[in-house]
């Protein structure tokens, strides 16, 4: 058939299919597949598209709530925020491409997640990201940071959506496999959400957007395999993005949606035309006939195999109402985009692909997705690590010196160098910029605001996957709460190593159980997400990194809280219990040189109780500044509040019942720092006692330094110098 290669065991293996999976294909279709069919099965049955190793565990996630309009299974999740408005959001990874070609990998990661959001009928209003890089001293790290940050900024800035928050971390376990997790958030009318399921027989299937090229072929398969020393050879499988074409595609899609032309819509992401066409047909219980001669291409002589597996960017597939076809075509031509009828829906439940008059593929459409192998892989739980007792930890330096050093380390230092390359205020609705607990974005034409955050602590997840999974969700919940938002829902991006290794699968299962428990207890459902496995190189896996993207609602964005101290002479209150937990803390790692111990346990009932009280204080107007406590503990949080305002703090000494370093740098969970006017302090403390919420006064705002009783003060200027210095110097070429 058109000189297609002969199917051999080597060719099957090169497509990422195991021998038993190929036998399953033979049984399913009753014959040997064509080369194009082999490519289609490879695309639909790989880990990236089929979730074959994770699906049985994902079923345990809580996904429903009265405000959830659409949970997992569509292009993005959708939640109701009242007044006929909905928030559409999702996070997904572009890890493997970004390691091979950092600029293009990052740009197309942003482009892909934006398409997922506007495919649902939403106008994107914000992006966030979570970036994990190797050790600063690794030979490729500086190059990868530079390329990824430029790519994220280049696409978002050109497309015209603000990048409002995220995370950046460094760890040697990401040396050979960085993580680029991108999140997009959009607004839509709650009664005008668009879905992927086709309906009606003989409806036109229309190709929209940019032309198809050879870029990105096998991109989804690459994302389903671990790296080795030849990973650089996969550079041709990295897609190339064009943010200006995507902006045109956005406007054209929203316009034809508004005109009532669309029956179903699916963006061409992983596995391109194959996955989008199969999903539209299978979800609608229909067949699909495609004629590849009609596909707009930008390269000559493309084969059916290449066209079906290309991951060229900025493309959509739609099922249109036949009577609206001409109107839709005129809209796309107006925006300068390709519009081509490439097929029709059929009652056959077959996926038929024709090219040059030949049938290149004829497969059962439901089985391509629904009959993908499903694995319950062996998994072993991670061994419990011993608790690190604070009294057994030698303090190598004083508290002030430790603060000054810690706040200038790669993970704790300012990421201004990163976020200043992103346009975080375009559209004019960013009310709280990067650097705080959560971004706050105004919902246009009203008082409402959205609180947005991305969180995970991978070292906790490695040490105890269950507690680490809980903590990732709790941290997102706290960050939203700290700005005054009511947490509504999350999207997750689950990044792990090779699931065929029982210890890695054990990490995945443990983290997922923790995420599920936290989401259930906090009433914080999962509405969308992405699983990225095989994140390892030469057998060395990344730290388990289940990134959590959280969305919350503020009824009035003008009443949000921020972390900056507001005035001198205000009372500083610590809410939540402090035990001085040093296991897996950044203090223990970066000051004491010990990356060890059990992570802090997460008491979800305390998280809910403490957080609800803090949110109540914000809404009542009592709290003047709020900051949640996480990496680095109490003193790092205090320093961040002081640097944000230029106002210092006069602090009481650590309680004698606790080791000083553990009190100041321990990472106990469910805690917040809150400032209140001096006149309110007594009343607030009494109210907290009545609510059984642990709350103590630890000091007073004022001066130009962090001054702890009995310790040498550290000036804000000194802290700010340390905080701001490392990343610009590192990226400027100074040694790590």
Swiss-Prot record:
ATP binds at residues 51, 90, 492, 529. Substrate binds at residues 93-96, 115, 239, 311-313, 532. Its main location: cytoplasm. GO terms for biological process: 'de novo' IMP biosynthetic process; purine nucleotide biosynthetic process. GO terms for cellular component: cytoplasm. It is an enzyme of class 6 (ligase). Mg(2+) 2 binds at residues 116, 267. Keywords: ATP-binding, Cytoplasm, Ligase, Magnesium, Metal-binding, Nucleotide-binding, Purine biosynthesis. The active site is at 48, 94 (proton acceptor). Mg(2+) 1 binds at residues 92, 530. SUPFAM superfamilies: PurM C-terminal domain-like, PurM N-terminal domain-like. The keyword Plastid does not apply. Its EC number is 6.3.5.3. Monomer. Part of the FGAM synthase complex composed of 1 PurL, 1 PurQ and 2 PurS subunits. This is Phosphoribosylformylglycinamidine synthase subunit PurL.
